[in-house]
Every structure is written in structure tokens, then in C-alpha cells.
Amino acid sequence: QGKVSSYHGDIPKLPLLSLLELGLLERRWQREMRNLPQDAPWAAARAGEWDAESIESWILKHVRTAGARDFARTLTRAMLCAEPRQVSYLCFLNYLRQGRGLNTLIGTEGGAQQDKFVGGAWQIPGRMAERLAGDIVLDAPVLAVEQDDDGVTVIARGERHRARHLIMAVPPLLASRIHFNAALPSKRNALNERMPMGSVIKIHIAYERPFWRQRGLN
């Protein structure tokens, strides 16, 4: 609406009742996420119940104030790049579990938002590429993977690349478009087809100087 507002900390200005409910929610999420085995969240006692519930349906059942509901939905969109109705509550709790809790995930000082790379994070793959020299093949989408007792053969744009081992570092949904011989387990195929990427556009804006710091906004 053309107005600029500011706040301190990780939580925006909300009505008192919403803030109190958010505090209770955070404690509940911390308690419930600790019930998930870190390497096997599906083995939790209430995994079936939580996986059958979307984040949105859970919010409607358990969150009363409008401010706390809106904040919980915003968290889902910001962290998972998906709508609350598209993600199970078990997935949400597991995300918190792997990220060491909500405060760490959204926090700046001592949290996930604290650090950045001078010059940009793109330098990580760039430096890795320098070490690999001429062993990188670009613009070659993989069509098929063949596996035998001696290793794997990767087929990409008509070329065959041989290796002892293969690390498949692509989104699960893209992996489902690759032909495997021998075939992947049926449960793995089903999982790949049911794990789409989030839908989001990120924009990075660079300014000549950090004017917001001079105004005491950061």
C-alpha cells in the first residue's frame, strides 16, 4: 500500500495474542520434530498421522489467531517454495528437524541467514570446475544409465561415459525421466515421481552502497 514498515528481530510486528500463539507454536514444533528419527522420519510413532495432514489443514485445526496463521503460511512459502496445502505436516517437521529448528532456519545471528560468500556463492561450483580441469561435460542431458558388475555407463547426447560409480545429483522428478538399466526399485521410482521442485523466482539486487545500514535498518 505504498508504506514502509520496519521491525527488529526475526518476527514482524503482530498483535500480542498472535505473538503469544507463535511462541507456543514454536515450542510445539520443536517438541514434535524431536520425535522424528533424523535419518528415518517415516519411522516416527505419529508419522502416518502427520503425513496424512497438509500444513494448511494442520494450521486450520490448531492455530487460532489470524496473525499466527498468516505467519505459518508465510514460513511454508519462504522455506519450501510451496503452498501449505501442497506439503505434508510430516515433511514440514522433518525440514525443521534437519535444519536444527525454526530459530536456526530463520535466524540471522547464529542462524542459517548469517553468512554469505564474498563475491557470490556461484564461486563454489566455479572453483570445483577449476580442479577438475577438462573432465567436465556441459550441455549434455543424461538420457540413460546402464549398470553392470564392473560399473556404470552414462548415455548423454549419443555419447557413452564409463565410470566405476555414479552420483545422481539432480532433483528427484528429473531423475524419473532418465532410463535406468537395471531399473530402480519401484518404491524409489514412485518417490521420484511424487517429489516436484518448489515453484519460486528469486531476485538478487545489488546497490552501489548499503544505504539501509546508514538509516539503521539493518
Regions found by a protein language model. Name each.
Residues 3, 150, 159-160:
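Short acidic/polar mixed-charge low-complexity motifs
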Residues 8-9, 151-153, 169, 198-200, ...:
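Conserved flavin/dinucleotide-binding core of flavoenzymes
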Residues 1, 66-72, 212-218:
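A short alpha-helix-loop-beta-strand transition element characteristic
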Residues 1-33:
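Dinucleotide-binding Rossmann-like beta1-alpha1 core, especially the glycine-rich loop
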Residues 187-215:
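Central beta-strand plus flanking loop segment that forms part of the substrate or channel wall
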Residues 37-141, 148-151, 169, 177-179, ...:
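Active-site/ligand-binding neighborhood in enzyme catalytic cores
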Residues 156-165:
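Core beta-strand elements of the Rossmann-like FAD/NAD(P) dinucleotide-binding domain
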Residues 165-186, 204:
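Flavin (primarily FAD) binding-site architecture
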